[in-house]
């Protein structure tokens, strides 16, 4: 998303620490956390989403993980208060149920190791409006497609706490702990975690960095990377410098590893050209797959009304870069699709960005 800077504190950062309202809300967070047996970040998320009405927020917390209004066709199933819900087993709403059979087919393929899938998505955690419903919307897609890896950008602490509760089947690695940050989620049953590394961007003005995670999948060594490169047209120079650092780190990864970068690059095509394009051994997955029109634009203010921008902007901010292992092409990109194209009950989309679902064949 095009932002000039990120908050150094939570959604109430505009209030001074000494104001009575701030103290009152802090006490409410403590009370909520005590009743719900959750941490303060989760308490703040639920209270803020429910206009700081304690009873309403608690009711929201203890309701089914998927809203009843969006799942009338299935039997009601309440989870125990404070219990951890496995994201991969959580039922989803009717608005995307038509895709379930496809998801089931993919799950079977994933079990035999022949397919590797991931999602990359800027989830716009900095937009506090309808945050909880939008988080549920994102999670419904994660549940439906059950990807092996998830790359996220613009995560905030309450959203991270929500994901930890809902996605117990994933290991979550974050790029930082405060403000807003990136995250990589690894399906524990499929992806073996080895190590992680955070590479700072020395001249960023927006708390940006490069998150790298080394893993293995079906005997294949992978280096996974994500970032949220500097935003807005006015910061193009810094963004291009960060992009060059990403390419350098992809080149430096061990030759035995397949390298995948997926994230919100904020790049314009002419900026890639100014940087000299991509190295010969690194490809842009969208271009490699023939530049499919249906998933070209991931930030589209004509189709996506979340920001309320009058101008029609269509940009391919979210990109996937791929470097095959030197020993041979054991993992090959196969398809790319957009996610999050349907409005939620609140009348908004899960994010101002569309998500990207990428599937790759694994040659066993």
UniProtKB/Swiss-Prot annotation:
Cofactor note: Binds 1 magnesium or manganese ion per subunit.
Residues with the N-acetylmethionine modification: 1
Compositionally biased intervals (Low complexity): 1-10
Cross-link position per record: Glycyl lysine isopeptide (Lys-Gly) (interchain with G-Cter in SUMO2): 23
Residues given in the record as Mg(2+) binding sites: 124, 154
UniProt EC number: 3.1.4.-
Cofactor(s) the protein needs: Mg(2+); Mn(2+)
Protein name: Tyrosyl-DNA phosphodiesterase 2
Gene: TDP2
